[in-house]
């Protein structure tokens, strides 16, 4: 399932040297550069709202209401596939390509004895790969961004990623990298505020101007430009929010009702 499954049940060093560093960088660098673009899908049902809780007016509630209203409009058009179920690395698929087999072999080396990738290990390998792409302007992936990525994909709340989870996340990053390059029309290495709506729609997120303004204030620099790591970080969080909503909307009504405990569990582990 997805992270919300565990919420409702009450839950809440790849950067090393040697042969692994070079080999892993080469293979994963090739994998990420293989993404030529593409976008997310649309589709989906009607609007949605958030029930539960009382409360008065005030600025905070008006802002929250606006955010939820915008998410309600957008989520109807975003229909992500759930992450694949966790499986042991030895269960090699018969139709796995040579590149995928090499990817799996290197994952085994990266993950170590527990066969899982931590946020720190994810950060190290992502930063190793992006250094091979000077056309992507980035300060590098920080630990908070990588913790968010792990939380989004962590189906059993171990705090780490198994092979299938890691591979699924990597495929998303490849897709989003292709979109990032395609919409960096001026080849500045960043996406400007005027380029952002098209990029997000290509990734499957149809948002209103109010949400775009909030995203720019949160993830872009003072000139309105968004670098690669912030672009990925933002998409990871959007993806998590929409997935969580759809998991909670079990009857497909477009509405959910959560209490404060469920809300905190949902928003704090993403």
Swiss-Prot record:
It is found in: Cytoplasm; Cell membrane. Residues 98-132, 141-174, 171-206, 207-235, 236-270 form the EF-hand domain. Ca(2+) 3 binds at residues 184, 186, 188, 190, 195. The modification Phosphoserine is found at residue 6. Pfam families: EF-hand_8 (PF13833). One of its GO terms (cellular component) is calpain complex. It comes from the Eukaryota. Ca(2+) 4 binds at residues 139, 227. PROSITE patterns: EF_HAND_1, EF_HAND_2. Regulatory subunit of the calcium-regulated non-lysosomal thiol-protease which catalyzes limited proteolysis of substrates involved in cytoskeletal remodeling and signal transduction. Essential for embryonic development. The contact of the 5th EF-hand domain from each monomer allows the formation of the homodimer and also appears to mediate the contact between the large catalytic subunit and small regulatory subunit for the formation of the heterodimer. EF-hand domains are paired. EF-hand 1 is paired with EF-hand 2 and EF-hand 3 is paired with EF-hand 4. The fifth EF-hand domain, left unpaired, does not bind the calcium but is responsible of the dimerization by EF-embrace. The first four EF-hand domains bind calcium, however it is not sure if the binding of EF-hand 4 to calcium is physiologically relevant. Homodimer or heterodimer of a large (catalytic) and a small (regulatory) subunit. In presence of calcium, the heterodimer dissociates. This is Calpain small subunit 1. It comes from Rattus norvegicus. The gene is Capns1.
